[in-house]
Amino acid sequence: MASRTRSESPLEPRLYAGAGSRADHPSLVLMLSVVMLVTCLEAAKLTVGFHAPWNISHPFSVQRLGAGLQTVVDKLNSEPVGLGNVSWEFTYTNSTCSAKESLAVFIDQVQKEHISALFGPACPEAAEVIGLLASEWNIPLFDFVGQMAALKDHFWCDTCVTLVPPKQEISAVLRESLRYLGWEHIGVFGGSSADSSWEQVDEMWGAVEDGLQFHFNITASMRYNSSSSDLLQEGLRNMSYVARVIILICSSEDARRILQAAVDLGLDTGEFVFILLQQLEDSFWKEVLTKDKVIRFPKVYESVFLIAPSAYGGGIGDDGFRKQVSQELRRPPFQSSITSEDQVSPYSAYLHDALLLYAQTVEEMRKAEKDFRDGRQLISTLRAGQVTLQGITGPVLLDSQGKRHVDYSVYALQESGNRSLFLPFLHYDSFQKVIRPWRNDSNTSWPHGSLPEYKPGCGFHNDLCKTKPPTVAGMTVTVTAVIPTVTFLVLASAAAITGLMLWRLRGKVQSHPGDTWWQIRYDSITLLPQHKLSHRGTPVSRRNVSDTSTVKASADCGSLVKRHQDEELFFAPVGLYQGNQVALCYIGDEAEAWVKKPTVRREVCLMCELKHENIVPFFGVCTEPPNICIVTQYCKKGSLQDVMRNSDHEIDWIFKLSFAYDIVNGLLFLHGSPLRSHGNLKPSNCLVDSHMQLKLSGFGLWEFKHGSTWRSYNQEATDHSELYWTAPELLRLRESPCSGTPQGDVYSFAILLRDLIHQQAHGPFEDLEAAPEEIISRIKDPRAPVPLRPSLLEDKGDGRIVALVRECWDESPELRPIFPSIKKTLREASPRGHVSILDSMMGKLETYANHLEEVVEERTRELVAEKRKVEKLLSTMLPSFVGEQLIAGKSVEPEHFESVTIFFSDIVGFTKLCSLSSPLQVVKLLNDLYSLFDHTIQSHDVYKVETIGDAYMVASGLPIRNGAQHADEIATMALHLLSVTTHFQIGHMPEERLKLRIGLHTGPVVAGVVGITMPRYCLFGDTVNMASRMESSSLPLRIHVSQSTAGALLAAGGYHLQKRGTISVKGKGEQTTFWLKGKDGFPVPLPEFTEEEAKVSEIL
């Protein structure tokens, strides 16, 4: 019988102080014993490691999910399942989500605690490196939170399994559901509000867009980051103009807000559909499905589809599991401060099932007399489907890659007896990848009795409906007469179209939509301004590429670089595409013709299909002139050349070897692909991502980029310093293939490896006093007694690496080694001891990353500061959208507005007031007054045009149109300004009362930006003159309005107008005008009309 700890509880914390920096971390050894009767055999003891942060603020905190382990043991004790003579011990030490500390904890658990399996890690910072180390040490790793996504290829972690279904699975369910229901046009709406703790938006958003973009028409994609109901409502209103089927990617709290906004907008009529995606959350939507708390459903829920796992809320014992975990967490040793079941992490259920699955697998292997301590054999048993489990999270069955498959259901409000409930409507089989009706008698209660259409009958813009022709007596005769003619034309057209299609097929021109899935719409990429990025240099705009400085594709569409005389590097434009940061490499407009070639299209498709961790991901190309460009993943650290150049100290040997490994692995993949070789290998084409992993770029698409697959190195415009890494046999050719040769890649690797050894950022021949043209001439000279090569010092690195470099740059291509043998040599030259390598690498990585960030910050601080000054100044002069267009280098076209309302005001007696005041006092007076005005108008939908002296000009209805609200907005604002003016006190003349006179007029105007130096947003038209006349003919403390404004206010209702009479207006003759006296319910006092004035006027 396995021994217990000293207390009566089977779970007791044991605190100890570890070595070094872990002395102050809470450590916990969870002693969980399965006590079984033993006859003659000695009990087997298995110690299992557990990795999760202690801090309760973390969503994967031990204090939120740790008791999931104890519940497993309680079940095994109370419900024996024949696990034999085994006792279990779980050890835990806080690693605070630090990759370095997690490594130390894991190594300590393996070497001292002799753990047989690891559950975790729960933090993404440590997942990849611990997964690799666990695979190296043959220790099974159970990922219960889905952090092993970085190791997508199970080859890299062949002892890992993941119990959380991948988010790509729910995207596939959504895709098949939309196909089944026949909905082709969709909108995507969602985000994360300030008070929402949902952290899956980015990952889920990317998975959904990746799964839908090539199969459906995404008419709108809107994200929010605010909890403002007004903003949500405005975004949903805009979405409703172009989409009837709306996919919501958000938390359950935000989903309820959005559905309420739909009710407020009148979108609950049954014409709109809201599809909610649910992966792990247990709050509101679980209550909906389990009918726990929701009794009555609002009408809008009849328009809701919910996609969730089929076992969502229905696992064995699920009803009481969260309650049990919550109770255990509040007891020792966890002593969690959680106060309700809602604070228990839903991942505790996956932790529970992971441990139970491991226990059952151990027992199955014991029965089969297999070594359950062999991690690979144990994981192979799981991947073979030999062990299944009906757990808290539903059926647990793993595929051959160690990933869990979960069936999903589509839930809808259906009739069940005499009430409506959310019940399964469709069922998705994750193994067969098909979707079927849940049952034949399901009766979904849509408001209009049938499934809604994905678009209105006449289209969103009424463009699908035509006016019906008049029905006259002779119409039938006319139509009948033209039927033969129309029939002939239709048949002739069909024959012509058929012939054209056959001709195109014979010419092998690929034209069906499936052949252009790699095309990216340029407007689907959001270009990021510099201050939002943390990379060195400045993005090069499309317009700047053709200036007088030398432009080169340093990474051949991996990272466009622009060189100036001071050798400062400027990176390619960076944008956001489908949630990914991407780099854009612009190609000449002549590529529009090249991309139509079948060979180019096939190669673009091939580039999209190349997937390897050491290859820069290729997203596609934009083919719309003048923005023809190649879109690849953005690598934050720049190129290998930048890493070497910006390093103030010698790069550690472990990093150099790591970079060399990455290059070799990438080239091995390329040489085994249809591309066969790289052809342009050099430091600027070796990009480094934020994880310091090297990825190759700059290969392929030669015909698309240059119009030919051949190139000449003898052109005068060639930058010879870029040819240092090109093999001499290729340099000697009059025309050589752009893709190079495998032997040429070996030579390029040798020069590149020598650059790494010597860490020379300015080329391998920087210590040779000769022009680049001369160096290239000497390299390709076949008669040279000793071929020219860069200097190579023996003491700079391992002797085997130096010898490898010499072999790889051999003059004879046939004598150069191949990359499999190069990889073997690198492995043999690597230091021994995996623990020390990984520990050292993590420490160096943190130091190196911090150093690079300091360099980035230092080099960009001044540029960012200057740019902010310009943007701030521009925002005070022009409307925001005008400023954005000017910054983007676009011209701002004048715009005609059919109806706006303009406000003019000035100060009565301002000239006399100025004569009694000093210039400084006048400036202070105007600043105080117009600062008060500026603050007041912020609560109205108006735009301040300008101030000239004591004149103040405001307009509504532009630059953003607001329908018929402009007169209402200006009138209410004028009343507020008149009210605040009566209480305004002049600083240097407190006894004086400031008197404002105001004029309003409504009519059409033209607005535009005038000038290049100090540009202004100006208004033109007779409406401006008339508004000025209304102000100049007004009286003190009065609002003078024209007849057109009065009509608009009467239509709006609630305003008190008084007829002034007929006055003479310059240039307009006699005009009937009015006084604006007030408004119903206006909350602040206004100056009163005198009785004498009232006698003259007639109240309407």
UniProtKB/Swiss-Prot annotation:
Q: SMART domains annotated for this entry?
A: CYCc
Tissue expression notes: Highly expressed in testis.
Q: Which family does it belong to?
A: Belongs to the adenylyl cyclase class-4/guanylyl cyclase family.
Subcellular locations according to the entry? Cell membrane
Species, as recorded: Mus musculus (Mouse)
Signal peptide position in this chain?
1-43
The stretches that face the Cytoplasmic side, renumbered to this chain, are: 503-1100
Positions of glycan attachment: 55, 85, 94, 217, 225, 238, 418, 440, 443
**What is the protein's quaternary organization?**
Homooligomer. In vitro interacts with NPR1/GC-A.
Q: Where is the Protein kinase domain?
A: 546-837
What keywords are annotated for this sequence in UniProt?
A: Cell membrane, cGMP biosynthesis, Glycoprotein, GTP-binding, Lyase, Membrane, Nucleotide-binding, Receptor, Signal, Transmembrane, Transmembrane helix
Q: By what name is this protein known?
A: Guanylate cyclase 2G
Topology in the membrane? Answer: Single-pass type I membrane protein
Residue spans crossing the bilayer:
482-502
Entry comment on modification after translation? N-glycosylated.
Molecular functions per Gene Ontology: ATP binding; GTP binding; guanylate cyclase activity; protein kinase activity
Q: What is its EC number?
A: 4.6.1.2
UniProt domain Guanylate cyclase: residue ranges: 901-1031
Reactions catalysed: GTP = 3',5'-cyclic GMP + diphosphate
